């Protein structure tokens, strides 16, 4: 039996630390059951460091990331509502950009 496909949903805004974002995203990319899609909501303009981290991940995993961008910060609630709408898989794994997931978090 195959594993169900799932989306990772994460929001990021300008006050986040790029190194935390990198660690958080990586912790989901190395899951025993890897994500089928990664929806990242840019809640307002970001720092160069955050944009750089996101660009690196898009280069490393072409086609995995779906970026939803807003020109101004609208808050976590709005970002997540819009992010859920952008997810296309039957299961959504919610992550904050400063969370770390155990490698077996998505184990079925």
Predicted regions and their residues:
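Nucleotide-sugar donor-binding/catalytic module of glycosyltransferases
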Residues: 1-108
């Amino acid at each position: 039996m195959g594993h169900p496909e799932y989306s990772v949903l994460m929001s990021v805004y300008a006050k986040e630390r790029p190194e935390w974002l990198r660690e958080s995203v990586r912790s989901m990319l190395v899951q025993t059951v890897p994500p089928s899609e990664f929806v990242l909501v840019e809640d307002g303009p970001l720092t160069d460091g955050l944009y750089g981290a996101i660009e690196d991940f898009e280069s490393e995993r072409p086609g995995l990331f779906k970026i939803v961008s807003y020109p101004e910060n609208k808050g976590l609630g709005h970002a997540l509502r819009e992010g859920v709408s952008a997810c296309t898989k039957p299961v959504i794994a919610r992550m904050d950009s400063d969370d770390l997931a155990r490698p077996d978090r998505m184990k079925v």
